[in-house]
Amino acid sequence: MEQPIQPSQHNTKQKRHKSRQRQAAPNVISQIIFASRWLQLPIYLGLIVVQGLYAYKFMKSLWELMTNLQSMDANMIMLAVLNLIDVVMIANLLVMVIVGGYEIFVSKLRTKDHPDEPEWLSHVNASVLKVKLSMSIISISSIHLLQTFVNAANMDEKTMMWQLFLHLGFLVSAVAMAYTDKILYSTSHKGH
């Protein structure tokens, strides 16, 4: 014979059911938010396409340098080489953004014990990536500045001045970011 449910038992079951419903809603929202990181995947795949375009640009510029070498003076050769270096540095920047960004924001890369794994990938985090990116941007800016000064006779003075200011802005920003990271790191590790 089945015993009737006491009012106190019924209230307890209702409370547990309502509690589970309240917990389920934030859990679903959390899962949706967490899964939204995969929306970045097409962006990183697009950057891989851009990297392919830079590889094409590099090969085209290299071919032009080789086929026109006889008609080029030393300055023209230097500008062509600096252009090739610029393309390489931008491609390196793309690799850092693609690999580091995917690793930090989307999903872990499963490259453990891979012989070609970059050294920095084992300890990549937002701070390391930020420093590497700022150093790459400064390096690319340096190459552009060097190209400008090698070609100074054909450049407007105002353009050269603005490129120099922009480069100095990159330098100041990098120093400020490094200082901020240092302060944040020392503050977060004080009690340890």
Curated annotation (Swiss-Prot):
Coiled coil: none annotated. Pfam families: UPF0114. Belongs to the UPF0114 family. The keyword Membrane applies. It comes from the Bacteria. It is a multi-pass membrane protein. HAMAP family: UPF0114. Residues 1-11 have a biased composition (Polar residues). Residues 1-23 are annotated as: Disordered. It comes from Pasteurella multocida (strain Pm70). The chain crosses the membrane at residues 38-58, 79-99, 160-180. GO terms for cellular component: plasma membrane. Keywords: Cell membrane, Membrane, Transmembrane, Transmembrane helix. PANTHER family: UPF0114 PROTEIN YQHA (PTHR38596:SF1). Its main location: membrane. This is UPF0114 protein PM1258. InterPro entries: UPF0114, UPF0114_bac. It is found in: Cell membrane. The keyword Flavoprotein does not apply. Residues 12-21 have a biased composition (Basic residues).
